[in-house]
Amino acid sequence: MKIGIDAGGTLIKIVQEHDNRRYYRTELTTNIQKVIDWLNNEEIETLKLTGGNAGVIADQIHHSPEIFVEFDASSKGLEILLDEQGHQIEHYIFANVGTGTSFHYFDGKDQQRVGGVGTGGGMIQGLGYLLSNITDYKELTNLAQNGDRDAIDLKVKHIYKDTEPPIPGDLTAANFGNVLHHLDNQFTSANKLASAIGVVGEVITTMAITLAREYKTNHVVYIGSSFNNNQLLREVVENYTVLRGFKPYYIENGAFSGALGALYL
């Protein structure tokens, strides 16, 4: 059996290949000892690691794994997934939305890291808890899916009420900027969480398309574990990317790009 592991700050992503079949699974990083014990009880032909906690695993297992830089591993894995999913693009920006978000430019041969922001899944969970007292990520994102941002976020259409705006009316003028205009309203947890995810999605997209413009590409690829069970984040990112005139790509199993790429480096 061949195993690639991306041991991140929040999740451990695992790719297994055996008998020409591929399997994906995740474990919380807090359960890293469980992963170590599992590896020590497996017959492993190839083991390759990446991510911030790769060294922790390598130090406690009986095997001799190879360790790779996570940016290179993610880029390689993304190349494989893009090809398998029929996306033929030569150069692009990709945003890896994990606990935080890193941005990379791929020129058809090599990747280079071109930026990063602290908005990502960590912000969704942390700010989401402060707004709702919910700690479970799946419960939080499920609730947010039912939220309405209009009572909380100030949109361009709210400012230009009776006239045609010079830019699309659905653009956000100020995140959370409509709250003081609706103090007589009851702000539900669903609405607050939807707006929090909106902030994350719009910041990530704004950064990604700015870099795409700088590197003269229309293609922006989004991967990362923050999209897991988070259709709202995906919609915000894809819609805003299109609205700004760029082409978004959401990659199935993109969160496993690092683990898959490590396996093939």
Curated annotation (Swiss-Prot):
GO terms of biological process kind: coenzyme A biosynthetic process
GO MF annotation: an example: pantothenate kinase activity
Residue positions of the active site: E70
Pathway where it operates: Cofactor biosynthesis; coenzyme A biosynthesis; CoA from (R)-pantothenate: step 1/5
Known catalytic reactions: (R)-pantothenate + ATP = (R)-4'-phosphopantothenate + ADP + H(+)
Classification via HAMAP family: Pantothen_kinase_2
Role description: Catalyzes the phosphorylation of pantothenate (Pan), the first step in CoA biosynthesis.
Protein name stated in the entry: Type II pantothenate kinase
Gene field: coaW
